[in-house]
């Protein structure tokens, strides 16, 4: 062909500055785009060969080579795919083939949000100009009698086309990096980026530095293949030893035979796992493979609890693996990672428009060929197809969890403490997930037995219908726990911060059901009857005595005959008041006066059956009454919640004082 010059066919010269600035939020994305193009060229050639429209040698090995040359400041991408003719270069490269280019420029020239532009109009190849001042393409089509073409473009607009001496089918793209982008010619940087985007592409990918000193390896002669470049043959002579025979004479014996080795150029190693685990059928995968894949991809030394293998062909193509990681405490970070792929090409992490928000606590990979490589999130938000994908993933996770609970509840219970924050969060965030999982949410009771919501209601049905008692700290609230156990009343343990909004949701969905913390009130199950006159007299006297001793005029005192005589005092806080206080803490309002919202709800309960309380009642002006009142109050608080540092110091000093008083008697 005669040499051809021209400018890229677009009605504005402003396209490449816009591409450079806004098309991609990550400038290293050009690696993915160019490698993906090469992968597509190979895939299309394979399909043409299957249809009898192309011929491929039986021993052909498809691959993509990347040459990172820091000395020349170049990056070269080579594939042995279907290549292009001069006409195809003119059509696909010289003409930026999308409609409405002027409208596109008008819409985006003043925009500053890359989300509005990413992935529009399929401009993948042109991402090369984000990092290169000059790009060349050498290509030879698979078509019979095709001639090789050289395309050369500087500054992203003016190009020349001419014949090339390229003899092998495929495409070679060379980027002459600009001064701001020479780091990409470093082989270690190139490998890092390729590992990010191309670790699982279906074609082998090899990276090398042509300017580096060659590396060698030594193999046995029988391991030599036609692909190896031989440097030299090495013969290691047989090893012998001198041994004494029975008659006392000595002889030389061969202990190791002669070894024939070959020194060769170091064999290249592909950075791509062409058949990642998610592409296989679940029946073909072993537990060990699932665990190895998890450690490799997520660099997590801990073992995953279990996993879900997604494998769907209709009504859309979707494959993937979701792992449930082990979380040691609720304070440990539970931020997961869901990697999204398109035909084994990495797109992005944690795209919430595709992956339901609550699944972001998991770790996994999702591969959906029907999603574009580059797509604006604003477009995804209103995409019905994407909503179907999200709903399907949610359904599969719910099916796995509910199925495990139904078929192997013991195993499900073993995982429950680790997965409960995830499931509860899912129920709060996703209505459909909540509907599927509501019968499989478990609550651990005081005997470490796991119960469903319905079973919890059955436990106390005879004594407290539609009430579920709970404790958020069984150790701190052990006095209350012991009283509940003594009366045969069950309670569940709710330790996680997500439990409060979760039980509020359950109460909204089940209007007659109430969750009540075990220190909210002392009901008739724990007390004996007391006459009104006795109650009134004791309450008035003890209230006056304790208010004076504690110097708290607003103290709310309640006198009851608690069955357990050893219990002297307790603190109760109404469920409504406590939830209000929790909400205030959550929203940073803990410094505000609870009285603004109806008081603290805290009540000091004194046991009229206890000897110490009886003594104070009989001796309101006694020598030690003041110190006893303070001590009983702090003991009540300690059984309810930790003392603050100042109160704890006073409690310790007072305890020492009481011991001194006792020692003097």
Range-by-range predicted roles:
Residues 1-184, 192, 199, 220-222, ...:
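GHKL (Bergerat-fold) ATPase N-terminal catalytic module, capturing the glycine-rich phosphate-binding loop
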Residues 117, 135-158, 178-182, 188-665:
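GHKL/Bergerat-fold ATPase module in large chromosome/replication-associated machines
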């Amino acid at each position: 062909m005669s040499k051809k010059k021209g400018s890229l066919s677009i009605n504005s010269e402003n396209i490449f500055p816009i591409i450079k600035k806004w098309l991609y939020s990550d400038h290293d994305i050009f690696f993915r785009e160019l490698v993906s193009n090469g992968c597509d060229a190979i895939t299309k050639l394979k399909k043409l060969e299957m249809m009898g429209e192309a011929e491929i040698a039986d021993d052909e090995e498809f691959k993509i080579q990347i040459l990172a040359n820091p000395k020349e400041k170049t990056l070269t991408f080579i594939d042995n795919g279907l290549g292009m003719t001069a006409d195809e270069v003119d059509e696909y490269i010289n003409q930026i083939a999308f409609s409405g280019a002027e409208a596109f420029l008008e819409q985006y020239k003043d925009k500053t949000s890359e989300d509005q532009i990413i992935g529009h109009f399929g401009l993948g190849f042109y991402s090369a100009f984000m990092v290169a001042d000059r790009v060349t393409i050498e290509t030879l089509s698979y078509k019979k009698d095709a001639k090789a073409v050289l395309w050369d473009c500087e500054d992203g607009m003016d190009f020349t086309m001419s014949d090339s001496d390229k003899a092998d089918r495929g495409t070679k793209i060379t980027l002459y990096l600009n001064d701001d982008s020479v780091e990409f010619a470093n082989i270690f940087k190139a490998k890092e980026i390729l590992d990010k985007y191309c670790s699982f592409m279906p074609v082998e990918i090899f990276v090398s530095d042509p300017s580096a000193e060659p590396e060698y390896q030594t193999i046995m002669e029988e391991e030599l293949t036609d692909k190896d470049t031989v440097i030299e043959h090495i013969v290691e002579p047989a090893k012998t030893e001198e041994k004494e025979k029975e008659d006392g004479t000595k002889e030389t014996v061969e202990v190791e035979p002669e070894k024939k080795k070959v020194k060769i150029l170091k064999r290249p190693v592909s950075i791509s796992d062409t058949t990642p685990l998610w592409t296989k059928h679940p029946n073909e995968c072993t537990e060990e493979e699932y665990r190895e894949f998890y450690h490799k991809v997520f660099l997590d030394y801990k073992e995953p609890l279990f996993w879900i293998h997604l494998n769907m062909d209709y009504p859309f193509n979707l494959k993937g693996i979701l792992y449930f990681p082990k979380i040691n405490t609720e304070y440990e970070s539970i931020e997961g990672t869901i990697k999204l792929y398109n035909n084994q090409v990495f797109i992005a992490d944690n795209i919430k428009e595709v992956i339901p928000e609550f699944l972001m606590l998991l770790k996994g990979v999702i591969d959906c060929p029907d999603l574009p490589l580059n797509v604006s999130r604003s477009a995804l938000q209103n995409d019905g197809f994407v909503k179907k994908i999200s709903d399907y993933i949610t359904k599969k996770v719910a099916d796995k969890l509910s199925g495990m609970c139904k078929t192997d509840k013991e195993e499900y219970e073993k995982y429950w403490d680790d997965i409960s924050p995830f499931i509860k969060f899912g129920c709060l965030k996703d209505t459909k997930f909540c509907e599927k999982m509501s019968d499989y949410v478990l609550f651990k009771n005081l005997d470490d037995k796991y119960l469903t919501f319905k079973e919890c209601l059955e436990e106390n049905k005879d004594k407290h219908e539609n009430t579920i008692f709970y404790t958020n700290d069984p150790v701190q609230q052990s006095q209350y726990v012991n009283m509940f156990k003594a009366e045969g009343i069950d309670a569940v343990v709710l330790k996680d911060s997500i439990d409060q909004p979760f039980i509020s949701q359950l109460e909204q969905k089940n209007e007659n059901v109430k969750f009540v913390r075990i220190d909210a009130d002392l009901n008739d199950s724990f007390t004996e009857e007391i006459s009104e006159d006795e109650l009134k007299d004791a309450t008035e006297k003890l209230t006056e005595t304790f208010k004076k001793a504690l110097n708290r005029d607003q103290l709310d005192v309640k006198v009851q005959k608690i069955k357990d005589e050893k219990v002297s005092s307790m603190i109760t806080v109404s469920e409504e008041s406590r939830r209000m206080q929790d909400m205030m803490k959550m929203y940073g309002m803990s410094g505000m006066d609870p009285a603004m919202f109806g008081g603290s709800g805290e009540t000091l309960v004194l046991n009229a059956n206890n000897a110490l309380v009886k003594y104070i009642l009989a001796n309101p002006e006694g020598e030690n009454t003041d110190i006893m009142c303070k001590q009983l109050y702090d003991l009540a608080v300690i059984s309810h919640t930790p003392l603050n540092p100042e109160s704890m110091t006073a409690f310790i000093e007072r305890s020492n004082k009481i011991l001194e008083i006792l020692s003097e008697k």
